Amino acid sequence: MAAASIALLTASFASACSSDNGGNALDQNLTGRGPITYVEGKDVTETGVVKQLIERWNAAHPNEQVTFKEQSADGTQQHDDLAEHFRAKQDGYDVVALDVPWTAEFAAKGWVQPLEGSFAIDTAPLLAPTVASATYNGKLYAAPKNTNGGLLYYRKDLVPNPPRTWTEMLGQCQIARDNNIGCYAGQLAPYEGLTVNTSEVINAFGGSFVGADGKTPTVNSPESKAGLKVLVDAYKNGDIPKEAITFKEGESASAFESGKLLFLRNWPYLYAQANADTSSVKDKFGVAPLPGNTGIGASTLGGYNAAISAFSKNKATAADFVRYLISEEAQQIVASGALPSVRASLYDDPALIAKMPYLPALKESIASAVPRPVTPFYPAVSKAIQDNAYAALNGTKSVDDAVAGMQKGIETAGS
């Protein structure tokens, strides 16, 4: 009875959201074909991945050309541009690249087409966590286009074997002190990066943030407190340098590249930078999956999911383009541009591994990854996580109070 009631409430909620925001747009233009527009944040890859993808498609589809609408590099601006467009029910955006945690929000509001029936895609070749990141309430709403996972960068000249657990890693901090460098850093400034870093350590210790309904808070648990405590204690005792709570991606990367850290949590893009001739750690570092409680940790997933707009006039073309984006051909272009692919087989490709030696570690990291909280209220949930985690780090809240604050913030996120 309880399960049936929850299912009924969930269905009613989804129906209400669709009615209020998308109307019957989800049932319209299902067979429409013609030119479409693809929307994604600024393409910062050296090889111009998005341009290559679209050129290949356009060469094979002269009557269904794709135009690239390039957004800014700022994630908040990307989100707000899409939201403004969809609130107005405009049909100018046909396929949109959603940052992973936005998928649930856009699905709940009826803004993107579920990938079922004639829009279904083959997810078998894809990494399972990437598919989970595009799923809301048991239904697939987007196709994973490219992914991302956290990696542990470590000084292999000082630490021959990478640690597998937080206890093992922090137990090696004396090596950092002996070499007059910091032990560990991540992205701990009060922004989305802190949500990511906090989520990873809490998930690694068995905690979670929201229930399957995307709304019920679950963070106030012994497991969540244990995870956050590890991070807070490491900062208090100096294993994490004091300046590290000002670090975003760039600052943390610079600290590692200049030889000031023994361990760093960061994304795969850093590998090429750290191995450049200008880097102080060129040929002196390795990469591994993030540490966990008793074994490999729980990376947070990054990347983009490609979704079909509910307001598109040419949804059949849009569906074919989405399928193309996850094809072997397209994903080879993605991977060659140093963007982590969503196809599992490419992580074992010898040619790609020769170019990107971190791929085996990244595959292992993504295989154990956990999506950021899957909720239609993600911006508010993320704010609750980062605000309270930062308060615990800087000592204005205890770990228990910070976790209780997250619980309350998640509880009120939809109000």
What role is predicted for each listed range?
Residues C173, K215-I245:
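Glycine-centered hinge/linker elements that transmit conformational signals in sensory
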Residues W267-K282, P291-D387:
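C-terminal lobe and pocket-closing loops
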Residues D94-A97, L262-N266:
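Paired acidic/hydrophobic, glycine-rich loop segments that form the ligand-binding mouth/hinge
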Residues G117-L126, Q187-E192, G207-A226, N275-D283, ...:
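Short, solvent-exposed loop/beta-turn-alpha elements that line the ligand-binding surface or hinge
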Residues M1-A104, S279, G292-T294, G409-S415:
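Conserved N-terminal structural module of periplasmic/extracytoplasmic solute-binding proteins
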Residues V100-G149, N161, E168-L170, K282-G286, ...:
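Hinge/lid segment of periplasmic solute-binding proteins
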Residues Q71-D81, P101, T167-E168, E243-E257:
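Short helix-initiation/N-cap motifs at beta->coil->alpha
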Residues G150-Y154, I202-N203, A306-I308:
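Short glycine- and hydrophobic/aromatic-rich loop-to-beta-strand nucleating segment
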